[in-house]
């Protein structure tokens, strides 16, 4: 009886070991397959995939923010008075000029929306000209790594080309005139410190910030939702993150 029990126990142990070995083989096979898939991608493949993701993101961003209330109706990118004008804003609201302040802020946002309509070609030119270094590092980085890389590499270029458009839209909707109404009233209050921020620069950079917010949104979609990978290169490149 004891010999039978020992024999049975040995069989159970043997089966358990065999099961564990088979499980390890399956896991090992999956890991190996993952490694093989990753090694099939070249640096150029990844660059092409990142470029396409940024292109799609730019199209999405421009469409989103250039619509009416694209900036003004989106809290995450709505343009408020420059920080150095916060005291002025608070003071004027207290003495009954809230609507005037709101009108000015709305005009800044509308200027950004109108300028964004012409931003796509500028963004696509920037994407085309940027040199993507460490493509695999960007691919395997944060959810907005490609967007942040593009921002770092192209903000000065975007600012240079977008600013004249912003100046034009500011003129069309009289942003400066609305600003003058605020500052004239505020500067007439005794003991206030006069302020004169560069609104053209400010609105241009805020326009760029808003565009990049939504480029990042689309990059996140492509990274995390297979259905957002609408081409073979996007599928091949971004499926690597799924392992």
Q: Residue ranges of each PLM-predicted region?
A:
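Bacterial Sec-dependent N-terminal signal peptides
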Residues: 1-24
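N-terminal Sec/ER secretory leader and immediately downstream segment
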Residues: 23-105
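A cross-kingdom marker for long, charged
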Residues: 25-32, 207-243
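Metal- and O2-centered redox machinery and metal/ROS homeostasis
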Residues: 39-42, 51-54, 193, 197, ...
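Second-shell loop/turn segments in exported
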Residues: 39-51, 94-95, 104-113, 123-124, ...
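Residue-level signature of catalytic and energy-coupling elements of molecular machines
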Residues: 61, 131, 226
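Mid-length scaffold segments of soluble, non-membrane domains
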Residues: 98-169
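An amphipathic alpha-helical core segment
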Residues: 165-206, 211
């Amino acid at each position: 009886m004891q010999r039978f029990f020992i024999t049975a126990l040995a069989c159970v142990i043997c089966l358990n070991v065999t099961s564990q070995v088979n499980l390890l083989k399956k896991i090992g096979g999956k890991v190996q397959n993952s490694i093989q898939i990753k090694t099939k991608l070249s640096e150029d493949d990844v660059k092409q995939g990142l470029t396409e993701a940024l292109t799609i993101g730019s199209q999405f961003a421009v469409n989103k923010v250039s619509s009416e209330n694209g900036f003004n109706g989106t809290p995450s990118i709505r343009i408020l008075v420059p920080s150095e004008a916060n005291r002025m804003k608070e003071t004027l609201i207290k003495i009954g000029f809230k609507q005037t302040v709101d009108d000015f802020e709305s005009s800044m946002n509308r200027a950004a929306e109108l300028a964004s309509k012409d931003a796509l070609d500028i963004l696509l030119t920037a994407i085309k000209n940027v040199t993507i270094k460490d493509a695999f590092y960007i691919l395997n980085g944060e959810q907005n790594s490609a967007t942040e890389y593009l921002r770092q590499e192209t903000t000065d270029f975007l600012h240079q080309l977008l600013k004249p458009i912003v100046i034009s839209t500011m003129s069309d909707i009289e942003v400066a005139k609305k600003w003058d109404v605020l500052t004239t009233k505020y500067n007439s209050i005794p003991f206030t410190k006069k302020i004169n921020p560069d609104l053209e620069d400010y609105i241009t950079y805020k326009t760029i910030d808003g565009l990049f917010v939504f480029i990042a949104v689309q990059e996140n979609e492509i990274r995390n939702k297979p259905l957002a990978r609408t081409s073979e290169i996007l599928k091949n490149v971004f499926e690597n993150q799924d392992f």
